[in-house]
Amino acid sequence: MRFPMIVAAAMVALPLSAPAQDTAARSLAATCANCHGTDGRSVGGMEPLAGMAKGEMVRKLNEFRTGAKPATVMHQLAKGYTEQQIDLIAGYFAAQKR
């Protein structure tokens, strides 16, 4: 009897957490706009982020964090994000149209 109540409570809470995650993802992704353009649509020499596969972006950000991928700025920026934040950022940009 207890398990169904826990499942029901979790089902009710799920919709409440999605908007908060969307807001957090959008806020984190906004920090990328200075170099990579609004919503990741770069107009200059920077790589566009909009539409990039989530797994690819997670991999690249982790490579910046570890120093496996050379960079001038990104290695420092990537170190400031948690795994959860990287996942949110990657999901946000993957959902954007190119």
Across the structure, where does each feature detected by a protein language model lie?
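Gly/Gly-Pro-rich "capping" loops immediately C-terminal to redox-active cysteine motifs
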Residues: 25, 39-69, 75-81
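The canonical Cys-X-X-Cys-His
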Residues: 30-38, 89
